[in-house]
Amino acid sequence: MSMQDPLADMLTRIRNAQMAEKTVVSMPSSKLKAAVAKVLKDEGYIADFQISSEVKPQLSIELKYFEGKPVIEEVKRISRPGLRQYKSVEQLPKVRGGLGVSIVSTNKGVMTDRAARAAGVGGEVLCTVF
């Protein structure tokens, strides 16, 4: 059976691993998942990530905790296969008054809502992280 929404699966694996207080979570890799992991690392939500060089590459994400609590409090899928959410640069959502980030897929790559505003581009709002 094929997976309908691989990005939602990635976010769910991260959420479940943090609830179970795991240090590393692995999943099948893709270009989009690697780009989202890079944004999460740049924003300080995860410690690191690696892509294995096997026949079927695996993405391993090293989770980050602060004083025993997960750094990611909430991760939510916004645009989904059944209802895509495209926003212009003016319509990009702010998460918790700017404390969290929206991850946006633009024609210039996957980036945060702040970077998209600075670049003056809109795109598909993939998820929000706080």
Swiss-Prot record:
The keyword rRNA-binding applies. Keywords: Ribonucleoprotein, Ribosomal protein, RNA-binding, rRNA-binding. One of its GO terms (cellular component) is ribonucleoprotein complex. One of its GO terms (biological process) is translation. InterPro entries: Ribosomal_uS8 (IPR000630), Ribosomal_uS8_CS (IPR047863), Ribosomal_uS8_sf (IPR035987). One of its GO terms (molecular function) is structural constituent of ribosome. One of the primary rRNA binding proteins, it binds directly to 16S rRNA central domain where it helps coordinate assembly of the platform of the 30S subunit. Belongs to the universal ribosomal protein uS8 family. NCBIfam families: PRK00136.1. Part of the 30S ribosomal subunit. Contacts proteins S5 and S12. This is Small ribosomal subunit protein uS8. It comes from Pseudomonas paraeruginosa (strain DSM 24068 / PA7).
